[in-house]
Amino acid sequence: TVGKLKPNRWYWFQFSVNGEESVIGRTRTMPKRFTSPKEMSFAFASCQSLEQGYFTAYDSMAQDELDLVFHLGDYIYEYTAGNQGTIRKHHGKEIESLSDYRVRHAQYKMDPLLQKMHARCPWFVTWDDHELDNNCADDISEQKNVKPVDFLIRRAAAYQAYYENMPLRRTSIPSGTSMKLYRKGSFGQLAEFSVLDGRQYRSNQPNNDVRSPINEAALNPGSTMLGTEQRNWLKQSLIQSRGTWNIIAQQVMMGMVGTSNNKKSLNYSMDQWPGYTHERMDLLRFMEDRKISNPVVLTGDIHSNWANELRKDDRKMDTPTVAAEFVGTSIASGGDGQDRIKNQDKLISDNPFIKFHNRQRGYVKCTLTQKTWTCLLYTTDAADE
Protein backbone atom coordinates (compact mmCIF):
# COMPACT_ATOMS: atom_id res chain seq x y z
CA THR A 1 0.00 0.00 0.00
CA VAL A 2 1.26 3.46 -0.93
CA GLY A 3 0.37 6.16 1.58
CA LYS A 4 0.82 9.90 2.17
CA LEU A 5 0.03 10.87 -1.42
CA LYS A 6 -0.70 14.54 -1.98
CA PRO A 7 -4.08 15.54 -3.45
CA ASN A 8 -4.55 16.74 -7.02
CA ARG A 9 -1.27 15.62 -8.49
CA TRP A 10 0.11 13.02 -10.90
CA TYR A 11 2.33 10.12 -9.85
CA TRP A 12 4.38 7.71 -11.94
CA PHE A 13 4.84 4.07 -11.00
CA GLN A 14 6.57 0.88 -12.10
CA PHE A 15 6.48 -2.73 -10.93
CA SER A 16 9.53 -4.94 -10.54
CA VAL A 17 9.16 -8.69 -9.95
CA ASN A 18 11.98 -11.26 -10.08
CA GLY A 19 14.16 -8.95 -12.13
CA GLU A 20 11.44 -8.11 -14.65
CA GLU A 21 10.21 -4.53 -14.90
CA SER A 22 6.88 -3.27 -16.15
CA VAL A 23 6.39 -0.24 -18.34
CA ILE A 24 6.12 3.04 -16.46
CA GLY A 25 2.53 3.99 -15.75
CA ARG A 26 0.97 7.07 -14.25
CA THR A 27 -1.96 7.79 -12.00
CA ARG A 28 -3.31 10.78 -10.15
CA THR A 29 -5.00 11.72 -6.92
CA MET A 30 -8.24 13.66 -6.95
CA PRO A 31 -8.52 17.27 -5.69
CA LYS A 32 -9.66 17.76 -2.11
CA ARG A 33 -13.43 17.67 -1.75
CA PHE A 34 -13.78 21.33 -0.72
CA THR A 35 -11.64 22.75 -3.53
CA SER A 36 -13.03 24.14 -6.79
CA PRO A 37 -11.22 22.78 -9.85
CA LYS A 38 -11.88 24.70 -13.05
CA GLU A 39 -12.11 21.63 -15.30
CA MET A 40 -12.27 17.84 -15.31
CA SER A 41 -11.89 15.49 -18.26
CA PHE A 42 -12.76 11.81 -18.30
CA ALA A 43 -13.80 9.01 -20.65
CA PHE A 44 -16.24 6.19 -20.16
CA ALA A 45 -16.31 2.83 -21.90
CA SER A 46 -17.87 -0.63 -21.69
CA CYS A 47 -18.40 -3.96 -23.44
CA GLN A 48 -15.15 -5.29 -24.89
CA SER A 49 -15.60 -8.80 -26.26
CA LEU A 50 -12.20 -9.70 -27.67
CA GLU A 51 -13.83 -12.25 -29.97
CA GLN A 52 -15.82 -9.54 -31.73
CA GLY A 53 -13.18 -6.90 -32.27
CA TYR A 54 -9.89 -5.26 -31.42
CA PHE A 55 -9.62 -2.66 -28.70
CA THR A 56 -8.70 0.08 -31.18
CA ALA A 57 -10.69 2.69 -29.28
CA TYR A 58 -8.22 2.53 -26.38
CA ASP A 59 -5.40 3.62 -28.70
CA SER A 60 -7.32 6.84 -29.39
CA MET A 61 -8.32 7.24 -25.76
CA ALA A 62 -4.68 7.01 -24.68
CA GLN A 63 -3.91 10.12 -26.75
CA ASP A 64 -6.31 12.19 -24.64
CA GLU A 65 -5.28 13.93 -21.45
CA LEU A 66 -7.82 12.41 -19.08
CA ASP A 67 -8.16 12.68 -15.33
CA LEU A 68 -9.82 9.28 -15.08
CA VAL A 69 -11.76 6.56 -16.90
CA PHE A 70 -15.07 4.97 -15.94
CA HIS A 71 -15.54 1.41 -17.14
CA LEU A 72 -19.21 0.48 -16.87
CA GLY A 73 -19.06 -3.27 -17.22
CA ASP A 74 -18.60 -6.26 -19.51
CA TYR A 75 -14.84 -5.91 -19.13
CA ILE A 76 -14.58 -9.63 -19.91
CA TYR A 77 -17.02 -12.10 -21.46
CA GLU A 78 -17.71 -15.52 -20.01
CA TYR A 79 -18.56 -17.44 -23.18
CA THR A 80 -16.85 -20.53 -24.56
CA ALA A 81 -14.22 -20.16 -27.27
CA GLY A 82 -15.70 -19.23 -30.65
CA ASN A 83 -19.15 -18.42 -29.27
CA GLN A 84 -19.13 -14.77 -30.31
CA GLY A 85 -16.87 -14.29 -33.29
CA THR A 86 -13.67 -15.01 -35.15
CA ILE A 87 -11.56 -11.86 -34.68
CA ARG A 88 -9.85 -13.51 -31.70
CA LYS A 89 -10.81 -16.49 -29.57
CA HIS A 90 -11.34 -16.98 -25.87
CA HIS A 91 -9.36 -19.73 -24.20
CA GLY A 92 -11.41 -22.78 -23.25
CA LYS A 93 -15.02 -23.40 -22.32
CA GLU A 94 -17.52 -21.08 -20.67
CA ILE A 95 -15.88 -19.99 -17.46
CA GLU A 96 -17.24 -21.17 -14.09
CA SER A 97 -14.39 -21.91 -11.66
CA LEU A 98 -11.99 -19.49 -9.98
CA SER A 99 -9.21 -20.76 -12.24
CA ASP A 100 -11.41 -20.18 -15.30
CA TYR A 101 -12.16 -16.59 -14.35
CA ARG A 102 -8.52 -15.85 -13.53
CA VAL A 103 -7.37 -17.16 -16.92
CA ARG A 104 -10.04 -15.15 -18.75
CA HIS A 105 -9.04 -11.94 -16.97
CA ALA A 106 -5.40 -12.66 -17.78
CA GLN A 107 -6.25 -13.18 -21.45
CA TYR A 108 -7.97 -9.80 -21.64
CA LYS A 109 -5.15 -8.08 -19.76
CA MET A 110 -2.72 -9.34 -22.42
CA ASP A 111 -4.21 -6.87 -24.91
CA PRO A 112 -1.54 -4.17 -25.46
CA LEU A 113 -4.01 -1.32 -26.02
CA LEU A 114 -5.90 -2.13 -22.83
CA GLN A 115 -2.57 -2.21 -20.98
CA LYS A 116 -1.66 1.13 -22.54
CA MET A 117 -4.84 2.78 -21.31
CA HIS A 118 -4.56 1.37 -17.79
CA ALA A 119 -1.10 2.95 -17.61
CA ARG A 120 -2.42 6.40 -18.52
CA CYS A 121 -4.73 7.37 -15.65
CA PRO A 122 -6.83 5.95 -12.79
CA TRP A 123 -9.95 3.87 -13.53
CA PHE A 124 -13.25 3.63 -11.68
CA VAL A 125 -14.75 0.27 -12.61
CA THR A 126 -18.00 -1.56 -12.08
CA TRP A 127 -19.29 -4.82 -13.47
CA ASP A 128 -22.38 -5.65 -15.48
CA ASP A 129 -23.41 -9.22 -16.25
CA HIS A 130 -20.69 -10.81 -18.43
CA GLU A 131 -18.07 -10.63 -15.69
CA LEU A 132 -20.21 -13.43 -14.24
CA ASP A 133 -23.07 -14.68 -16.47
CA ASN A 134 -25.28 -13.07 -19.10
CA ASN A 135 -28.35 -11.26 -17.69
CA CYS A 136 -27.83 -12.65 -14.20
CA ALA A 137 -29.81 -11.23 -11.29
CA ASP A 138 -28.56 -11.70 -7.72
CA ASP A 139 -28.36 -15.49 -7.25
CA ILE A 140 -30.34 -16.29 -10.41
CA SER A 141 -28.50 -17.60 -13.46
CA GLU A 142 -29.60 -17.11 -17.04
CA GLN A 143 -29.69 -20.91 -17.25
CA LYS A 144 -33.00 -21.99 -15.75
CA ASN A 145 -31.71 -25.37 -14.54
CA VAL A 146 -29.01 -23.87 -12.29
CA LYS A 147 -29.84 -23.84 -8.59
CA PRO A 148 -29.18 -20.60 -6.67
CA VAL A 149 -26.78 -22.34 -4.29
CA ASP A 150 -24.70 -23.58 -7.23
CA PHE A 151 -24.80 -20.20 -8.93
CA LEU A 152 -23.53 -18.50 -5.77
CA ILE A 153 -20.47 -20.76 -5.85
CA ARG A 154 -19.80 -19.55 -9.38
CA ARG A 155 -20.46 -15.97 -8.32
CA ALA A 156 -17.91 -16.20 -5.51
CA ALA A 157 -15.29 -17.34 -8.02
CA ALA A 158 -16.13 -14.53 -10.44
CA TYR A 159 -16.03 -11.89 -7.70
CA GLN A 160 -12.69 -13.11 -6.34
CA ALA A 161 -11.07 -13.02 -9.78
CA TYR A 162 -12.58 -9.60 -10.47
CA TYR A 163 -11.14 -8.17 -7.27
CA GLU A 164 -7.72 -9.68 -7.99
CA ASN A 165 -7.55 -8.19 -11.48
CA MET A 166 -9.25 -4.80 -11.23
CA PRO A 167 -8.28 -1.48 -9.57
CA LEU A 168 -10.47 -1.54 -6.46
CA ARG A 169 -10.43 -0.34 -2.88
CA ARG A 170 -9.94 -2.58 0.13
CA THR A 171 -13.61 -2.03 0.96
CA SER A 172 -14.40 -4.22 -2.05
CA ILE A 173 -12.56 -7.32 -0.80
CA PRO A 174 -15.02 -10.21 -1.39
CA SER A 175 -16.73 -11.77 1.58
CA GLY A 176 -18.06 -15.23 0.78
CA THR A 177 -20.40 -14.89 -2.18
CA SER A 178 -20.76 -11.10 -1.84
CA MET A 179 -18.64 -8.09 -2.70
CA LYS A 180 -19.39 -4.43 -2.05
CA LEU A 181 -18.71 -2.62 -5.31
CA TYR A 182 -20.82 0.54 -5.05
CA ARG A 183 -18.84 3.54 -3.83
CA LYS A 184 -18.34 7.30 -4.13
CA GLY A 185 -15.66 9.58 -5.45
CA SER A 186 -15.27 13.29 -6.10
CA PHE A 187 -13.27 15.78 -8.10
CA GLY A 188 -13.34 18.63 -5.64
CA GLN A 189 -16.63 20.48 -5.73
CA LEU A 190 -16.79 20.26 -9.50
CA ALA A 191 -18.20 16.73 -9.58
CA GLU A 192 -19.17 13.90 -7.30
CA PHE A 193 -19.73 10.43 -8.67
CA SER A 194 -21.65 7.44 -7.39
CA VAL A 195 -20.58 4.13 -8.93
CA LEU A 196 -23.42 1.59 -8.78
CA ASP A 197 -23.83 -2.18 -8.82
CA GLY A 198 -26.92 -3.09 -10.81
CA ARG A 199 -26.54 -6.89 -10.72
CA GLN A 200 -25.72 -8.24 -7.26
CA TYR A 201 -28.84 -7.05 -5.46
CA ARG A 202 -31.49 -6.99 -8.18
CA SER A 203 -34.65 -9.06 -8.22
CA ASN A 204 -35.31 -11.30 -11.20
CA GLN A 205 -36.25 -9.61 -14.46
CA PRO A 206 -40.05 -9.43 -14.84
CA ASN A 207 -41.99 -10.96 -17.72
CA ASN A 208 -39.39 -13.74 -18.09
CA ASP A 209 -36.91 -11.12 -19.33
CA VAL A 210 -38.86 -10.74 -22.59
CA ARG A 211 -39.47 -7.29 -24.10
CA SER A 212 -42.90 -6.26 -22.82
CA PRO A 213 -45.17 -3.26 -22.25
CA ILE A 214 -44.92 -1.43 -18.92
CA ASN A 215 -47.36 -3.76 -17.19
CA GLU A 216 -48.11 -4.74 -13.60
CA ALA A 217 -44.97 -6.87 -13.37
CA ALA A 218 -42.73 -4.01 -14.49
CA LEU A 219 -44.47 -1.66 -12.04
CA ASN A 220 -44.13 -4.04 -9.08
CA PRO A 221 -43.06 -1.95 -6.02
CA GLY A 222 -41.22 -4.98 -4.67
CA SER A 223 -38.90 -5.25 -7.68
CA THR A 224 -35.49 -3.66 -7.36
CA MET A 225 -32.33 -3.23 -9.37
CA LEU A 226 -30.25 -1.69 -6.59
CA GLY A 227 -31.57 -3.31 -3.43
CA THR A 228 -32.75 -1.33 -0.42
CA GLU A 229 -29.34 -0.67 1.14
CA GLN A 230 -27.69 0.58 -2.05
CA ARG A 231 -30.72 2.67 -3.04
CA ASN A 232 -30.75 4.39 0.36
CA TRP A 233 -26.99 4.91 0.15
CA LEU A 234 -27.37 6.55 -3.28
CA LYS A 235 -30.07 8.90 -2.04
CA GLN A 236 -27.99 9.89 0.99
CA SER A 237 -24.93 10.42 -1.20
CA LEU A 238 -26.88 12.72 -3.49
CA ILE A 239 -28.27 14.70 -0.55
CA GLN A 240 -24.80 15.18 0.93
CA SER A 241 -23.13 16.03 -2.38
CA ARG A 242 -21.42 19.39 -2.79
CA GLY A 243 -20.70 18.78 -6.45
CA THR A 244 -21.87 21.03 -9.26
CA TRP A 245 -22.34 17.84 -11.26
CA ASN A 246 -23.63 14.60 -9.77
CA ILE A 247 -22.52 11.65 -11.87
CA ILE A 248 -24.26 8.29 -11.52
CA ALA A 249 -22.05 5.68 -13.22
CA GLN A 250 -24.01 2.50 -13.79
CA GLN A 251 -24.78 -0.28 -16.24
CA VAL A 252 -28.11 -0.37 -18.10
CA MET A 253 -30.31 2.15 -19.93
CA MET A 254 -32.39 4.36 -17.67
CA GLY A 255 -34.21 6.00 -20.58
CA MET A 256 -37.52 4.25 -21.24
CA VAL A 257 -36.82 3.31 -24.85
CA GLY A 258 -39.75 1.42 -26.35
CA THR A 259 -39.94 -0.36 -29.70
CA SER A 260 -43.20 -1.01 -31.50
CA ASN A 261 -42.49 -3.69 -34.12
CA ASN A 262 -45.66 -2.51 -35.89
CA LYS A 263 -47.74 -3.15 -32.77
CA LYS A 264 -49.90 -0.54 -31.06
CA SER A 265 -48.11 -0.70 -27.71
CA LEU A 266 -44.40 -0.16 -27.14
CA ASN A 267 -42.29 -2.96 -25.72
CA TYR A 268 -39.39 -2.35 -23.33
CA SER A 269 -36.31 -4.22 -22.15
CA MET A 270 -37.02 -5.93 -18.85
CA ASP A 271 -33.29 -6.20 -18.10
CA GLN A 272 -32.94 -2.42 -18.22
CA TRP A 273 -34.56 0.17 -15.93
CA PRO A 274 -38.04 -0.09 -17.56
CA GLY A 275 -38.23 -3.56 -16.01
CA TYR A 276 -37.91 -1.83 -12.63
CA THR A 277 -40.12 1.16 -13.41
CA HIS A 278 -41.34 1.73 -9.84
CA GLU A 279 -37.80 2.05 -8.46
CA ARG A 280 -36.76 4.17 -11.44
CA MET A 281 -39.65 6.60 -10.87
CA ASP A 282 -38.87 6.72 -7.15
CA LEU A 283 -35.24 7.71 -7.81
CA LEU A 284 -36.09 10.39 -10.35
CA ARG A 285 -38.87 11.76 -8.15
CA PHE A 286 -36.33 11.94 -5.32
CA MET A 287 -33.84 13.86 -7.49
CA GLU A 288 -36.56 16.28 -8.54
CA ASP A 289 -38.00 16.81 -5.07
CA ARG A 290 -34.57 17.30 -3.46
CA LYS A 291 -33.38 19.52 -6.32
CA ILE A 292 -30.20 17.50 -6.81
CA SER A 293 -27.66 19.59 -8.70
CA ASN A 294 -27.19 18.53 -12.33
CA PRO A 295 -27.64 14.74 -12.12
CA VAL A 296 -26.09 12.94 -15.09
CA VAL A 297 -26.39 9.18 -15.64
CA LEU A 298 -23.59 7.32 -17.45
CA THR A 299 -24.55 3.99 -19.01
CA GLY A 300 -23.00 1.15 -21.04
CA ASP A 301 -24.37 -2.32 -21.88
CA ILE A 302 -26.11 -1.94 -25.24
CA HIS A 303 -23.24 -1.32 -27.68
CA SER A 304 -24.56 2.02 -28.93
CA ASN A 305 -24.46 5.75 -28.23
CA TRP A 306 -27.50 7.61 -26.89
CA ALA A 307 -28.23 11.01 -25.40
CA ASN A 308 -31.49 10.95 -23.43
CA GLU A 309 -33.54 13.34 -21.36
CA LEU A 310 -34.81 11.57 -18.23
CA ARG A 311 -38.20 12.23 -16.67
CA LYS A 312 -40.09 10.41 -13.94
CA ASP A 313 -42.07 8.90 -16.82
CA ASP A 314 -40.36 9.38 -20.17
CA ARG A 315 -43.67 8.79 -21.94
CA LYS A 316 -44.93 12.14 -20.59
CA MET A 317 -42.95 14.73 -22.52
CA ASP A 318 -44.89 17.63 -20.98
CA THR A 319 -43.29 16.96 -17.59
CA PRO A 320 -39.94 18.43 -16.43
CA THR A 321 -36.61 16.89 -17.36
CA VAL A 322 -34.97 15.63 -14.17
CA ALA A 323 -31.60 14.34 -15.42
CA ALA A 324 -29.55 13.66 -18.52
CA GLU A 325 -28.32 10.25 -19.61
CA PHE A 326 -25.35 9.55 -21.84
CA VAL A 327 -25.10 5.96 -23.02
CA GLY A 328 -21.69 5.00 -24.40
CA THR A 329 -21.16 2.45 -27.12
CA SER A 330 -18.99 -0.65 -26.87
CA ILE A 331 -15.25 -0.87 -27.28
CA ALA A 332 -15.59 -4.02 -29.43
CA SER A 333 -18.77 -5.97 -28.63
CA GLY A 334 -21.19 -6.23 -31.52
CA GLY A 335 -18.49 -6.08 -34.19
CA ASP A 336 -18.68 -3.47 -36.94
CA GLY A 337 -21.33 -0.84 -36.23
CA GLN A 338 -23.27 1.73 -38.22
CA ASP A 339 -24.00 5.42 -37.95
CA ARG A 340 -27.77 5.13 -38.45
CA ILE A 341 -30.11 2.18 -38.20
CA LYS A 342 -32.87 1.54 -40.73
CA ASN A 343 -35.76 2.45 -38.43
CA GLN A 344 -34.00 5.30 -36.59
CA ASP A 345 -36.58 7.96 -37.46
CA LYS A 346 -39.41 5.80 -36.09
CA LEU A 347 -37.37 4.94 -32.98
CA ILE A 348 -36.95 8.63 -32.15
CA SER A 349 -40.54 9.43 -33.10
CA ASP A 350 -41.75 6.77 -30.65
CA ASN A 351 -39.29 8.02 -28.01
CA PRO A 352 -38.90 11.81 -28.43
CA PHE A 353 -36.73 12.10 -25.31
CA ILE A 354 -33.90 10.53 -27.37
CA LYS A 355 -31.71 13.37 -28.62
CA PHE A 356 -28.98 11.32 -30.30
CA HIS A 357 -28.40 7.72 -31.35
CA ASN A 358 -25.49 5.97 -33.09
CA ARG A 359 -24.29 2.35 -33.27
CA GLN A 360 -20.60 2.54 -34.10
CA ARG A 361 -17.86 1.26 -31.80
CA GLY A 362 -15.83 3.64 -29.63
CA TYR A 363 -16.00 5.59 -26.38
CA VAL A 364 -17.21 8.90 -24.93
CA LYS A 365 -15.03 11.73 -23.62
CA CYS A 366 -16.58 14.27 -21.24
CA THR A 367 -15.18 17.66 -20.24
CA LEU A 368 -16.75 19.47 -17.29
CA THR A 369 -16.52 23.05 -16.06
CA GLN A 370 -18.65 24.80 -13.46
CA LYS A 371 -21.06 25.87 -16.21
CA THR A 372 -20.77 23.34 -19.04
CA TRP A 373 -20.69 19.60 -19.75
CA THR A 374 -19.32 18.67 -23.19
CA CYS A 375 -19.44 15.15 -24.65
CA LEU A 376 -17.31 14.06 -27.60
CA LEU A 377 -18.15 10.68 -29.12
CA TYR A 378 -15.19 8.91 -30.69
CA THR A 379 -16.21 6.19 -33.13
CA THR A 380 -14.63 3.74 -35.54
CA ASP A 381 -16.23 2.17 -38.60
CA ALA A 382 -14.64 -1.25 -38.17
CA ALA A 383 -13.99 -3.44 -35.15
CA ASP A 384 -11.63 -5.79 -37.00
CA GLU A 385 -8.91 -3.20 -37.64
Ranges and model annotations:
Residues T1-T380:
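Metal-dependent phosphoester/phosphodiester hydrolase catalytic core
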Residues D381-E385:
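A short, hydrophobic C-terminal helix/tail in secreted or cell-surface proteins
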